[in-house]
Amino acid sequence: MRRTSRRKAGTIVAAAVLGLTAGCGGGGGAAAAPTPHASKTITVSSTAFAEGATIPRRSTCDGENVSPSLDFGGVPGEAAELVVLVEDPDAPHGTFVHWVVWGIDPHETALGTGELPNGAEQGRNSFGKRGYGGPCPPKGESHRYVFSVFAADAKPTLPKDASADDVKRALIGHTAAYGTLVGRYGR
C-alpha cells in the first residue's frame, strides 16, 4: 500500500509541476500551446538577412511592412504542407505573433518578399489582423524574431482566423521536420 501511495503522490506532484509550468510566460492570458518538435531539420535562410543579423527596415513597421524572403531546404518527402510562424519571444507581455501561414505546398523552396503562395492561408497575428505584421519593438529596445518553418505530415483543419496556438496544437504529433531562422530588429 505504501508503494501505491508513493506512486500516487509522485503522480500528483508531477501533474502539479506540469500544471504550474504550463501557465508560465504568457502575460496572464491562457497558456500558450507547446511548440511542436521533430527529429528532422529544415534549413531556413533569407536573402534579406543572415542568422542573428538585423531584419531590413523594409520588412518592419518602420518600412513597407512586407514579409522578408525565406528559403527552406531539407523538407522531407512525407510532408503534406508547410507552416510558417514568426514570433517575438522578447515582447514585454509574452511571445508576440507577427505571422501565421499554413497550406504552403511542400514542394515550395522559397517565399519571395511580400509573397504568399497560391493555396496558402494566413491566420491572426497579435496585432489582431490576418497577415504579416512586421517587427515593431518599443523604442529603445532590440528584439529577436523567430521565423519557424514546420513540415506537417497531414494538412491541419484550421479556421480562417487561426492563431499561432491553434496551429501549434494542430501540429503536435504531425510535425515531420522543423527549422528556424532568427533575426533582430531594434528601434
Region spans (language model):
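N-terminus-centered regions that define maturation/targeting leaders and the start
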Residues: 2-187
